[in-house]
C-alpha cells in the first residue's frame, strides 16, 4: 500500500498545504510523472487541477524532471535539481530518482494550476468560524 505526503502549493496565496493520502487515492498517483496535471479530487480538492512538480523518496533522493522512469540512478550533473556546484564548471556524480511516481516515493510536491469554486481552506477543513465569510 502506498502512502504519500502531498505538499500542494497555492501560487495566488503564497501558501502550501500538506495532505496525507493513502490507499486508493495514493494508487491513483502511481505512474504519474513530473509535469502531469491531475484532478484535485485525489487530494480532497474537488474542482481543482493540480500539477505535479517534484518529490523525494524515503532516503531523501529528489526526483529529477528529465530523468525517465521511477528508479534511482547515479548521474553526472553540473547544475540543476539536487546539486549546486561550489565552483564554476564543477561536475559531480549524484544519486537522483526518475520523474515517475512509484510506491517508494514518500513526498510529492504539487501546485494548483486551475482553481475550483470553494476555497482550499474550506475543502481541507482548515477554515475557522472567524475566517468563514458571513452569510448575509
Swiss-Prot record:
PROSITE patterns: RIBOSOMAL_S6E (PS00578)
Keywords annotated in UniProt: Ribonucleoprotein, Ribosomal protein
Keyword Membrane: no
GO BP of this protein: translation
GO CC terms in record: ribonucleoprotein complex; ribosome
Molecular functions per Gene Ontology: structural constituent of ribosome
HAMAP family noted in UniProt: Ribosomal_eS6
Classification via NCBIfam families: PRK04290.1-3
Name of one Pfam family that matches: Ribosomal_S6e
Family: Belongs to the eukaryotic ribosomal protein eS6 family.
Name of this protein: Small ribosomal subunit protein eS6
Amino acid at each position: 500500500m502506498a502512502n504519500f505526503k502531498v505538499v500542494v502549493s497555492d501560487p495566488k496565496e503564497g501558501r502550501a498545504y500538506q495532505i496525507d493520502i493513502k490507499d486508493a487515492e495514493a494508487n491513483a498517483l502511481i505512474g504519474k510523472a513530473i509535469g502531469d496535471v491531475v484532478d484535485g479530487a485525489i487530494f480532497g480538492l474537488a474542482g481543482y487541477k493540480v500539477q505535479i512538480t517534484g518529490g523525494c523518496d524515503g532516503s531523501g533522493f529528489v526526483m529529477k524532471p528529465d530523468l525517465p522512469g521511477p528508479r534511482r540512478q547515479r548521474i553526472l550533473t553540473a547544475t540543476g535539481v539536487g546539486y549546486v556546484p561550489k565552483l564554476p564548471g564543477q561536475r559531480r556524480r549524484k544519486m537522483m530518482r526518475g520523474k515517475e511516481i512509484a510506491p517508494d516515493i514518500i513526498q510529492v510536491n504539487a501546485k494548483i494550476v486551475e482553481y475550483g469554486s470553494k476555497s482550499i481552506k474550506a475543502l481541507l477543513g482548515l477554515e475557522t468560524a472567524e475566517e468563514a465569510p458571513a452569510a448575509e
